């Protein structure tokens, strides 16, 4: 697989070519994903739940993400590698720069941060200092205590309009990817259409430029709960490599997620 950059994703968006992405946490699975030419991997703070056994992502530290970023980069030298910035690691622009630098040195090509237009100054500071940013909107798991649980976001018109404005503001500030989680498919389509940057969805219908799944959900090995928008591709294939290939094939064809795996 050739080295993937943000320019490839932008070109694919312009061409209408959909792409699949996944979380990854170690070198072995990263190597598996690279063998199937998975273009983008995310070292997600979801590791707090699927690896550390926590109830949410809040306990994850920058050091945790940096460690797993090094592991994933070792297994997948050519993917575009995103790394989550954990809870309260970007409370100020200055703090964000310091912590993002640690993740970039660990091998990330981009950092992902959760939140709306209040992050504009942070995104500007990061991108002006050569740190690419993915902006995460919708259900932002680090805000679980504000939301009162993991709930669909943007269902009413006012909140939907606000999310569109947030997405445009973050793009203007320099965000190069927007990730939408658990938002109505109609809203995801609207945001995907108005943005020039690639939009990745999870639980947001099949209209976004890309899709992402938590690796453990894709393989049906999550310990407690399988979200409705996820699909066990391993159950259909009986082989992990074939499962990854099937996931990528269905995303590229626009057949995943289908209605059964769309939550709103």
UniProtKB/Swiss-Prot annotation:
Residues annotated for 3-methyl-2-oxobutanoate binding in this entry: 45-46, 84, 112
Organism: Vibrio vulnificus (strain YJ016)
Protein name from the UniProt record: 3-methyl-2-oxobutanoate hydroxymethyltransferase
GO cellular component, one term: cytoplasm
UniProt keyword terms in alphabetical order: Cytoplasm, Magnesium, Metal-binding, Pantothenate biosynthesis, Transferase
Record bears the keyword Membrane: no
Chief place of localization: cytoplasm
Catalytic reaction list: 3-methyl-2-oxobutanoate + (6R)-5,10-methylene-5,6,7,8-tetrahydrofolate + H2O = 2-dehydropantoate + (6S)-5,6,7,8-tetrahydrofolate
Chain's role: Catalyzes the reversible reaction in which hydroxymethyl group from 5,10-methylenetetrahydrofolate is transferred onto alpha-ketoisovalerate to form ketopantoate.
């Amino acid at each position: 697989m050739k080295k993937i950059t943000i320019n490839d994703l932008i070109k694919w968006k312009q061409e209408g070519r959909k792409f699949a992405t996944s979380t990854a946490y170690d070198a072995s699975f990263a190597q598996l994903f690279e063998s199937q030419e998975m273009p983008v991997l995310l070292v997600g703070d979801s590791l707090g739940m699927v690896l550390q056994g926590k109830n949410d992502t809040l306990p994850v530290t920058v050091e945790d993400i940096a460690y797993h970023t090094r592991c994933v980069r070792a297994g997948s030298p050519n993917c575009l590698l995103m790394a989550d910035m954990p809870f309260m690691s970007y409370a100020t622009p200055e703090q964000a720069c310091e912590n993002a630098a640690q993740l970039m040195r660990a091998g990330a090509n981009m950092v992902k941060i959760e939140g709306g237009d209040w992050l504009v100054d942070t995104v500007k500071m990061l991108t002006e200092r050569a740190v690419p940013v993915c902006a995460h909107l919708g259900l932002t798991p680090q805000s679980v205590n504000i939301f009162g649980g993991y709930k669909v976001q943007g269902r009413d018109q006012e909140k939907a309009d606000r999310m569109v404005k947030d997405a445009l503001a973050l793009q203007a500030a320099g965000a190069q990817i927007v990730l939408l989680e658990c938002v109505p498919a109609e809203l995801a389509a609207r945001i995907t259409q108005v943005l020039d940057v690639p939009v990745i969805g999870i639980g947001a219908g099949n209209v976004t430029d890309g899709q992402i799944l938590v690796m453990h959900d894709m393989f049906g090995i999550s310990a407690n709960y399988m979200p409705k928008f996820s699909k066990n591709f391993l159950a259909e294939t009986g082989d992990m490599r074939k499962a990854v290939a099937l996931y990528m094939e269905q995303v590229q064809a626009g057949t995943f997620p289908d209605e059964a795996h769309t939550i709103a």
